[in-house]
Amino acid sequence: SRAGTSGHWFVGDGMVHGLVLGNGAAQSYRNRWVRTEPYVAGLGFGKGAPGGGNSQSNVSVFWHGGKLLSSGEVGFPYELNIADLSTVGAWDYAGALTGSFTAHPKTDPATGRMHAFGYGFTAPFLEYYIIEPDGTMSHRETIATPRSTMIHDFQITETDAIFWDLPVVFDLDLAIQYINDP
């Protein structure tokens, strides 16, 4: 995390690392900051990359639908150039994604479909997505939940997606109060 920002790793900036292997040895290494909107704004480069949410894109990197993507727990995933790890920009699945996107999508090995979800601080608290092997979102469903909880991960079976109802509950009013008066 840059100087003057939180030291908590949940809110740190994302950095990706790439290692090329060949002939039994490392051939090259590189790393790049994921140039999310908050990262670019923090560097004073003016308006950040297009996209929604406040994504640090700091948790996972995955390949699906012909794209290398980086994701955090909130906001959109970010597309990365596989050749040099530069940031292409926020990826919203051709406008189908309007809320947050998990850092832990699951790809069904039998179908190649990627299953994902997004959770938020305001209703709807949970949305479930299915993305086809070509990268198009084919299914988006709101799942009714009584409150906003941190749904860090989930599981899939051949027929179901399983979401955990965990005890970490978000209180938006308390968060706003803390922001205004830490």
Describe every region a protein language model picked out.
Residues S1-G51:
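N-terminal regions that are enriched for targeting/export leaders
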Residues V11, L21, W63, T107-P109, ...:
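Generic beta-strand structural signal
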Residues D13-M15, F76-L80, A123-Y129, V169-Y178:
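Structural motif
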Residues A94-T98, A144-T149:
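Short coil/turn segments at the loop-to-beta-strand junctions that recur within blades
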Residues G118-F121, I130-E132, E141-T145, Q155-D160, ...:
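Short, structured patches in soluble enzyme cores that scaffold and shape functional sites
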